[in-house]
Amino acid sequence: MWAFSTARIGSPLAATSVTLRRCLRLGVAMAKSKFEYVRDFEVDDTCLPHCWVVVRLDGRNFHRFAEKHNFAKPNDSRALHLMTKCAQTVMQELEDIVIAYGQSDEYSFVFRKRSNWFKRRASKFMTLVASQFASSYVFYWRDYFEDQPLLYPPGFDGRVVLYPSNQTLKDYLSWRQADCHINNLYNTVFWALIQQSGLTPVQAQQRLKGTLTADKNEILFSEFHINYNNEPHMYRKGTVLVWQKVNEVRTQEIRLPAEMEGEKMAVTRTRTKLVALNCDLIGDAFWKEHPEILEGED
């Protein structure tokens, strides 16, 4: 009797299970269409494993943008701080970015070697960084340019480059900082010749043609009494963004024994926050001070 009863109860359950499986298979089949072959034309842009993924953004036609929006020459601190604010937003909103470096109208974002964010698709890295950065630039514009309306939306192009070792990554960042120094020294002399000596842009270019670093430093010092080494670090070295653990002390009410109820105590908590630095990336000193950036990635 028990065997017969069990068979009759189990039978409807088994039938229901079979029917459900058939419906699921039918649903999958119906979800496909004759047009689905177009997916075969999509390019596999998966980044190679065990490589640092670097996304570099550059402002599109920013010479014109800076001119139209009355940027100060040779450097506008408002524009540089706005760029850094946008970069901070990118690092806070997106995943696996361990360090960023920016100067002028460009920023580079370094994703962890082991990142599997969006299955390491280069198009996702590039488009998400570019869109987050560009939208942040518009969103925070008024915080830095209170008296200058945004006349038209800015644009940023992006590229993805893979670096297979810690040394190649360090060399990349050193290259970008060396570029910052070369460009800023030239621009500092160029605009001094225009603004203080009254030269035209063409005349200033001719004056600087063929000059070396020592020559430019000499022009600045002898003609304009400017010691380039005393120029702000942000202009000369660019900005580095890193995550740092900091101790935060706050006074707050906490649960205490009855005899101490109502009292406040200072509570220290460790948290990770973004820190902006204007320091040397060239050489080993920075990497010795921040070993956590490269640790555990090989």
Curated annotation (Swiss-Prot):
Q: What class of enzyme is it?
A: transferase
Which InterPro entries does the protein's record reference? Answer: Thg1_C_dom, tRNAHis_GuaTrfase_cat, tRNAHis_GuaTrfase_Thg1, tRNAHis_GuaTrfase_Thg1_sf
Give a Gene Ontology cellular component term annotated to this protein. Answer: transferase complex
**Binding site residues for GTP:** 58-63, 104-105
The cofactors required by this protein are: Mg(2+)
For the ligand (Mg(2+) 1), the binding residues are 58-59, 105
* A Pfam family per the record: Thg1C
E.C. code: 2.7.7.79
Copy out the cofactor comment: Binds 2 magnesium ions per subunit.
Which residues does Mg(2+) 2 bind? Answer: 58, 105
Subcellular location per the Swiss-Prot or TrEMBL entry: Cytoplasm; Mitochondrion
Key words, A-Z: Cytoplasm, GTP-binding, Magnesium, Metal-binding, Mitochondrion, Nucleotide-binding, Nucleotidyltransferase, Transferase, tRNA processing
Q: Which reactions appear under catalytic activity for this entry?
A: a 5'-end ribonucleotide-tRNA(His) + GTP + ATP + H2O = a 5'-end phospho-guanosine-ribonucleotide-tRNA(His) + AMP + 2 diphosphate + H(+)
Give the function comment from the record: Adds a GMP to the 5'-end of tRNA(His) after transcription and RNase P cleavage. This step is essential for proper recognition of the tRNA and for the fidelity of protein synthesis. Also functions as a guanyl-nucleotide exchange factor/GEF for the MFN1 and MFN2 mitofusins thereby regulating mitochondrial fusion. By regulating both mitochondrial dynamics and bioenergetic function, it contributes to cell survival following oxidative stress.
Assembly and interaction partners: Homotetramer. Interacts with MFN1 and MFN2; functions as a guanyl-nucleotide exchange factor/GEF for MFN2 and also probably MFN1.
Family to which the UniProt record says this protein belongs: Belongs to the tRNA(His) guanylyltransferase family.
Q: What is this protein called?
A: Probable tRNA(His) guanylyltransferase
**Organism in which the protein naturally occurs:** Rattus norvegicus
Its lineage opens with:
Eukaryota, Metazoa, Chordata, Craniata, Vertebrata
